[in-house]
Amino acid sequence: MTTTLTRPADGDGSVQVHQDPGTKIEEGALVIAVYGKGGIGKSTTSSNLSAAFSKLGKRVLQIGCDPKHDSTFTLTHKMVPTVIDILEEVDFHSEELRPEDFMFTGYNGVKCVESGGPPAGTGCGGYVTGQTVKLLKEHHLLEDTDVVIFDVLGDVVCGGFAAPLQHANYCLIVTANDFDSIFAMNRIVQAIQAKAKNYKVRLGGVVANRSAETDQIDKFNERTGLRTMAHFKDVDAIRRSRLKKCTIFEMDDKDDGVKAVQDEYIRLASNMLNNVEPLEAVSLKDREIFDLLGFD
């Protein structure tokens, strides 16, 4: 077992899943955890960002941390089996596995892993993430990696699904220019504040997605100390790329808006590689968000 429950932990009086030292990712790789409200486009953002890093010559590994295991299919062009599914087939004897059993090569050489998750209502997502990282380390698959991206389930910030924050250098929060998305973002900021007490993770910034404007995001950023790292408008080619099971970099750049989206992803990847300054954002109380955003 790779994770333990201890008290006290990150939050005051809370019980959290803590990282087993044996699952620690070695220094050197840039590790990014991508969070955001459910359905906001985290997997699309993560996959396109992975592709952008690969375009910059980096060796990239993307780890999907969602029981739906659909994080990487635009990179691999198919749904791949999860780590948990594969481990169950060998009765959790990981020594019987080969890397090609659970890691798949996607667009432009991006390595793809889907951790999967426990059955609904059982188990812990943090344990699954820990098992995945442990398996990757056992097979020495993290040693030749420049960038690791964790694409994390929805806006669930319990101790389990906050586990990828224990491995990450930075967290990127994907949001839209609406109240519900920003409300979820505030909760994620709170989780990062808790994890940053004991782990190296820091806020990298915000990715504004599927939003023509960013006025509400800007208002929240100014109040909390966040910043927008990239802005993707509601370009139909992004939706169509998902339907075609491919990244935005595989779409015709002559299509309306495609080149601008590609350039924005490259810009985001470049900025993340340049030792982006971590943010010391301060979350708001729920009532403060209601007062800040609309509701005049």
Swiss-Prot record:
Swiss-Prot/TrEMBL catalytic activity: chlorophyllide a + oxidized 2[4Fe-4S]-[ferredoxin] + 2 ADP + 2 phosphate = protochlorophyllide a + reduced 2[4Fe-4S]-[ferredoxin] + 2 ATP + 2 H2O
Cofactor note: Binds 1 [4Fe-4S] cluster per dimer.
Keyword Signal on entry: no
Binding site for ATP: G39, I40, G41, K42, S43, T44, K68, N209, R210
Cofactor dependence: [4Fe-4S] cluster
Binding site for Mg(2+): S43
Region annotation (Disordered) ranges: 1-21
GO BP: light-independent chlorophyll biosynthetic process; photosynthesis, dark reaction
Binding-site positions, [4Fe-4S] cluster: C124, C158
Domain of life: Bacteria
Membership in a protein family: Belongs to the NifH/BchL/ChlL family.
HAMAP family xrefs: ChlL_BchL
Function statement: Component of the dark-operative protochlorophyllide reductase (DPOR) that uses Mg-ATP and reduced ferredoxin to reduce ring D of protochlorophyllide (Pchlide) to form chlorophyllide a (Chlide). This reaction is light-independent. The L component serves as a unique electron donor to the NB-component of the complex, and binds Mg-ATP.
Subunit structure, as described in the record: Homodimer. Protochlorophyllide reductase is composed of three subunits; ChlL, ChlN and ChlB.
PANTHER family noted in UniProt: LIGHT-INDEPENDENT PROTOCHLOROPHYLLIDE REDUCTASE IRON-SULFUR ATP-BINDING PROTEIN
The name this protein goes by in its record: Light-independent protochlorophyllide reductase iron-sulfur ATP-binding protein
Source organism (scientific name): Synechococcus sp. (strain CC9311)
Gene (name only): chlL
